[in-house]
Amino acid sequence: MPDGSINPWVIAVTVTLATFMEVLDTSIANVALPHIAGNLSASADESTWVLTSYLVSNAVILPLSGWLSSLLGRKRFYMGCVAIFTLSSFLCGFAASLGMLVVFRILQGVGGGGLQPSEQAILNDTFPLSKRGMAFAVYGIAVVVAPTLGPWLGGWITDNFSWRWIFYINVPVGILSLGLTYLLVSDPPYMKRIKLSDGFRIDYIGLGLISLGLGSLQIILDKGQRDDWFDSGFIRLFAVLMLVGLIGGVIRELKAKEPVVDFRMLKDRNFAISTLAMFFLGFVLYSSTVLIPQMLQQLLGYPAEMAGLALSPGGATIMFCMPIVGFLVSRVDTRYLITFGCTISASALLVMAGWNLSLDFKHAVLGRVLQSFGLAFLFIPINVSAFANVPREKTNMGTGIINLARNIGASVGIATVTTLLERRTQLHQMRLMDHVNNMNPALKTKLAGFAAASISGGSSGPGGAAQAHGMLFNMIERQATMLAFLDNFKLLGVIFFGIIPIFFLLKRPKMGGGSVPVH
């Protein structure tokens, strides 16, 4: 516990700095991939390992963060993560080849993986129960706003400077965070460092199995669509490794006296339901964050910077609403807050499922704002419920597990909507093409209009007819793609409505005790 003379809000800002940069890094590199590939003489497919390598190492460290905090001491572990993340960010910007960049991104993911769980545990010990909701609202703002800023900021930096600066910008923030953490943060009395010489044993087999399973899962999710899923021997190999690692790892950890990841925490009903809810929250949040800018660019012709800006008002909405939810969470039944948030967000997604190719930028922004308003009512209440009955000494372990659930949900969600987008587009194209026949009077009218436009543009004869058919096919392709986007929005809305009943299985938290970290 920090010295009482230190303002706890200063500590909150200190530990939020590095977490904001880490979450930002999960999305900021996406738009820079073509520049990275060109500069480092790599193919487009090879350059995607810049993303995959970070996600794999990050996913492996997340559930281990609680165990590592106990082993090393939480402050020491957190500062080590900040130092590794900062140094590897500099090395990423300095990389002279794709291989070097991938290695440094793995290291960056290792450093970043422990930041969020450690920050949540630090905030939990820094603030009294009555103020934790507001404290974790600050953290929640950083976690939600950073992914929405990432694509826009990455594009702006790449266009105006160099792709290397998307990594260099982490360095001064990391150094500042490291210095402030050293001066301001300390471990609470109960959080004593466990030394190996005192008999603390490392379950190397469990550690290896969990790492193998999570790493393989992340590779499958990141590469599956590109390699046509299980038609690829590469994906089948990693599917086998994933099953061996996860099944073997869970069995091993359930039997271990000192588990690396304590899955026994899922015996607590509130923690188990909240972990499942966090999976779906990650699924819907990150999927929609990918879909909206992609739709605006691909179908409506907006530049990348404008498409990214469409998400910003949603981030501002969450920034405004999070403190209000932090105030309400100790006064209103969390089950009602969660139900309200799910209902609003699901309704917004179903409204999006009614969009068409005449959509303007304003209505796209309004849809995201409405969805974000609902999302703001989910993060804090879900986690208040999750940790209501978790012993304080288990907080570090629990934050790692629930963060992992959210990140896996995000990866599964993005992989799902990306696959559905391609396959539903093909399906809708086939259905629309069924209406293309010479006996269809509407088709004749449309072709005549296209032909007239071609002739007025200088084409004539067979060339004009061919151009008219090309214009018709482009129209069908755009319409089919739009329908596929709408199918995805509908799916996400149905998921959010579908999970509402499980929240009424939660036991209402007693606000007088328990630990309340928020993700």
Predicted regions and their residues:
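Transmembrane core module of solute transporters
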Residues: 6-70, 78, 99-102, 162, ...
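Structural signature of transmembrane alpha-helices in multi-pass secondary transporters
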Residues: 22, 51-54, 58, 85, ...
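Small-residue-rich segments within alpha-helical transmembrane domains of MFS-like 12-TM solute carriers
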Residues: 23, 27, 93, 109-117, ...
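Helix-loop-helix hairpins in multi-pass membrane proteins, especially solute transporters
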Residues: 62-207, 232-233
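Small-residue-rich alpha-helical segments with characteristic i,i+4
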Residues: 146-151, 288, 364-449
